[in-house]
Amino acid sequence: MKRLKITVIVLSALIFLSGCRAKPDGTSSSAEPPTAVAAAGSRNYLTMLYSAADTFNPYTAATNINRQLCRLLYEPLLKTDNSYNISYSLAQSAEVKGKECTVTLKSRYFSDGSALTADDVVYSFNLAKKSNTEYAYKLYEALSATARDSKTVVIKLDRADPYFANTLDFPIIKKGSDTKTDSDGVTHPPIGCGRFKLNDSEDKLITNEHDPGKDRAIKEIRLINAPDSEAVGHYVEIGAADMYYSDISDGNILRMSGKKVNINLNHLIYIGANLSDEQLSLNALRQAISSGLDRKEICRDGYFNNALPANGFFNPAWEAVKSVQNINLQANKEITVENLEEIGYNKLDSAGVRTNGAGKKLKFELLVNKENRLRVTAARIIAKRLSEYGISVNVAEKSFADYTAALSSGNFQLYLAEVAITPNMDISSLITEGGSAAYGIKKPEKKADEKTEQTGSTESTASEAEQTEEQNLTAAELVSGFYAGTNTLADLSSVLQTEMPVIPLCYRTGVLFYNDKIENVNNSSCSDIYFSIDSYSVGE
């Protein structure tokens, strides 16, 4: 059988059509961030936007601006930084063994002076699980949480997951404080262990005197009421707020003068293929499409540099996969053409479209949700680039309803989409037949005589027998084996890149704009955009 060329170096070692597992090793940190003290010529406050009509309950807040402020009012057990490493907050440790995660708590206090206990964590866990928030989405593997003692919580899982602890960034509130009312029957926001607390009139955040970082330079957060998206846009554009964050999920980017930092999101942009299609079921064709695309171009011109080019299936910012992912980021015409000719598409018709000996043409339709302008732009870039190799792609811009209907019915060839990967880096729903985001995926047929040729490899780190065994496993089987502890991330990455069930393009980033007088804005992440607020300083 002819040898298949692909663009990767194989090392042996829910669909979001529009967020961010724990490293159980020494890369995790429980150290408190450094604290800045206000100096002469600086101010001790920040001004931010909020919605007075919305709540500061982290499990019911509806607006993005209030949800982000909740990260200052309520601390989680742990956070992940912008490279998906764990930084412990209220937890001293989070140890995952098999189907159980044991969390040990630090000695910390709520803003009312009462001590944090395991019962508060269990209460918050149950709220998170039943909420309509990202926290419920992340905790899909968690079955229950119980208090072993006042400082220990045990979380039962439905399967083993070495990176489960990365999902434990749900806000911790004082047990029952979300249901208490005042003498007028008004329910106020719950009590947290955050860096700040609400003042009595609930229109300003002030220092929580029971927080270890209380001596930070920033003593209060002054709030401006922005009741709707139009008001938010206005205040951002005129610079009324010192900081503003957007995940750009709708494709619209607000501009604010000053500085900005990109926030890594675990949102994969990819091309999905209907593997029931005779042509697209050919691995060589999917490899050709992958190698023919310039991922840097898509990030630059499609997403205005608010994305990281994907060198594999997992987020390239994740330290654990930096040495095991190596899809080419720029287009490789030679490899693309070789792959196409290997499967018989070695002629061009009068329109420049590749055909095989039977007259079959490489003509496809690429579905895209027309309601997201960034994705539409990316789809057009993809079509233009592939046309250079004789692959004709018609971009079909559909309404969200029509787009999802086509995917659900299987009435498509190619589609451009975005999926939010949970912080435990679980991509099984995307690549496993029957998965919630696995449109067009089916278990590939194994051929005993099929071989692949890896290009660019200079050395082998596994025996030929081991490589053959890995290649005989499908990506879905390797995912299952990874959680069972029989396969490594290197194994999984290798087979994903060889099998190419979908074509990864890039991982989107959000953006945090901030006043150019603010210093030390470091390691802001989707887990906490104010990650380093204890070290902020603001010039006058």
Predicted regions, residues:
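C-terminal motif of bacterial Sec signal peptides marking the signal peptidase cleavage site
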Residues: 17-19
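N-terminal lobe/hinge region of extracytoplasmic solute-binding protein
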Residues: 48-96, 126
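Aromatic- and charge-enriched surface segment that lines or borders ligand/interaction sites
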Residues: 90-132, 279
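Surface-exposed binding/hinge segments that line
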Residues: 95-96, 137-179, 197
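Gly/Pro-rich hinge or "lid" segments in bacterial periplasmic/extracellular proteins
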Residues: 166-220, 230, 333, 338
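Ligand-site clamp/hinge motif
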Residues: 207-253, 392
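Append "and occasionally in soluble cytosolic enzymes with long acidic Gly/Pro-rich linkers
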Residues: 282-383
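Detector for C-terminal structural segments
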Residues: 292-324, 374-383, 407-540
